[in-house]
């Protein structure tokens, strides 16, 4: 919603020492490519010792087993995933169903059904594939879950924050954002400057869909 320079400024104001950019081709790609691209860039700095990420599942053993299983999927699992995709399932759902049908441990299947855990598993896979010595540090995802639309307590999901910003309701975000971020957003809204939202692209997307051939 906000340009990369403003987001980088917020990160630095919040205590980050370095902000790195992930190319759009990777940031808009699958969790696997997103994770591998991110870890590859971090490895390139030569100073990566720990990789911290949020996850609904925090048992390291489960995430490591899931990373191993998804790195060496059998032909049967791959074929089932292909069939599921042809039925219109999303890739995460297709893989979840394929693993469940193959008798994979239920705790691994559960971890792969949670969005943040799935990305964490891909980070662990990427660390292994790139031969990194960095140690994964798992942080428990609590209170506001992925895509939660509620603004309550002291935590809010990114989805809920984006919705509030799109509704130009900055005041409701005061307790959920760092002071610098809140003041910048409030200042923009007071000047009538709205950040880019999905509604700004709806006509373009609709045109593209209607122009597609069968």
Residue ranges and their predicted role:
Residues 17:
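Receiver (REC) domain switch/active-site residues of two-component response regulators
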Residues 1-7:
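N-terminal catalytic cores of NTP/NDP-binding nucleotidyl/phosphoryl-transfer enzymes
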Residues 22-214:
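Active-site cores that bind ATP or allylic diphosphates and position pyrophosphate for catalysis
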């Amino acid at each position: 919603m906000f340009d990369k320079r403003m987001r980088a400024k917020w990160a630095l104001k919040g205590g980050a020492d370095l902000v790195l950019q992930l190319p759009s081709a990777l940031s808009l790609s699958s969790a696997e490519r997103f994770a591998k691209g991110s870890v590859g860039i971090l490895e390139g700095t030569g100073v990566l010792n720990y990789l911290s990420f949020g996850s609904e599942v925090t048992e390291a053993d489960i995430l490591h087993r899931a990373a191993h299983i998804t790195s060496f999927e059998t032909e049967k699992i791959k074929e089932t995933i292909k069939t599921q995709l042809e039925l219109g399932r999303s890739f995460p759902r297709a893989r979840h169903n394929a693993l469940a049908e193959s008798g994979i441990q239920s705790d691994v299947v559960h971890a792969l059904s949670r969005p943040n855990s799935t990305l964490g598993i891909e980070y662990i896979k990427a660390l292994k594939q790139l031969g990194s010595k960095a140690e994964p540090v798992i942080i428990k995802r609590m209170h506001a879950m992925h895509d939660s639309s509620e603004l309550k307590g002291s935590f809010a999901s990114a989805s809920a924050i984006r919705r509030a910003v799109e509704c130009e309701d900055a005041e409701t975000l005061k307790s959920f954002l760092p002071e610098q971020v809140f003041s910048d957003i409030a200042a923009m809204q007071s000047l009538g400057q709205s950040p880019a939202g999905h509604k700004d692209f709806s006509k373009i997307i609709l045109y593209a869909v209607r122009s597609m051939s069968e």
